[in-house]
Regions:
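Membrane-embedded segments
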Residues: 2-3, 8-19, 25-34
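Electron-transfer interface patches adjacent to heme c in soluble/periplasmic c-type cytochromes
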Residues: 18-28, 112-156, 169-185
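Extended, well-folded interaction surfaces typified by the phenylalanyl-tRNA synthetase beta subunit core
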Residues: 43-56
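Sequence context of c-type cytochrome heme-c attachment sites
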Residues: 1, 15-18, 68-72, 130-135, ...
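Periplasmic/extracellular electron-transfer cofactor-ligation site
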Residues: 3-10, 38-41, 90-125, 137, ...
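Electrostatic cytochrome c docking/interface patches
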Residues: 61-90, 107
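The canonical Cys-X-X-Cys-His
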Residues: 31, 85, 92-102, 147, ...
Length: 203
């Protein structure tokens, strides 16, 4: 939740530890408990290749000071309703990490929250859709149940199926969004339907 490595270094914010800093203590403990059930794998992590390694740490600190956003971790998470959906969206599923456009140096444009990103700025060069409630360019015509269905099954209202990174997060490796409780998927849907509608045709 702070991006600090075991040797005290700071990782680049490619790992979204800023949003994760708002995850509830009870959920962090559950996540760690789950990770400790996995079979150990001995595999060294390759060093990130930069021309001057020292600059990587300096750049990370500078970026975080200028643009980083950290949160206070609550003891427990909201249990229901839109507040539950907001918590899951912003600190667990971190939907905005992909669906909010970023600048060339990775700064999220929070005025375009969830409004999608074109292939030139989307993660891994993928087109990321606008999921605000805008009825023309977003998903404002979708019912809450349809949003929940997509999160769990990957199926859109037109019976098409998601692809790319969204498919990956739904399926997961051992677990993914498909394992989400339906009431949590509906809470996320309710929150997404409550955010500002932004007209942004992604291309």
């Amino acid at each position: 939740t702070k991006g600090v490595t075991r040797d005290g270094g700071r990782t680049l914010p490619l790992m979204p530890y800023g949003p994760y800093s708002g995850m509830a203590q009870e959920d962090l403990k559950a996540l760690i408990a789950f990770l400790r059930t996995l079979k150990p794998v001995r595999k060294p992590t390759p060093e990130l290749q930069t021309s001057v390694p020292m600059l990587r740490s300096i750049a990370a600190e500078g970026w975080l000071k200028a643009f980083g956003q950290f949160f206070t971790s609550p003891a427990t998470a909201p249990k229901s309703g839109i507040e539950r959906g907001k918590y899951l969206t912003e600190h667990v599923a971190i939907c905005g990490d992909c669906h909010t456009p970023r600048s060339s140096i990775g700064v999220p444009n929070r005025s375009m929250y969830m409004a999608g990103a074109g292939k030139d700025i989307g993660p891994l060069g993928e087109l990321v859709p606008n999921i605000t409630p805008d009825k023309e360019t977003g998903i404002g015509t979708w019912k809450r149940e349809e949003i929940a269905d997509l999160l769990i099954t990957g199926t859109k209202p037109d019976l098409d199926y998601v692809r790319g990174l969204m498919y990956d997060v739904i399926q997961g490796t051992s677990h993914g969004y498909r394992n989400m409780r339906r009431e949590d998927a509906l809470a996320i849907a309710d929150y997404i339907k409550s955010i500002s509608a932004i007209k942004n045709k992604v291309k």
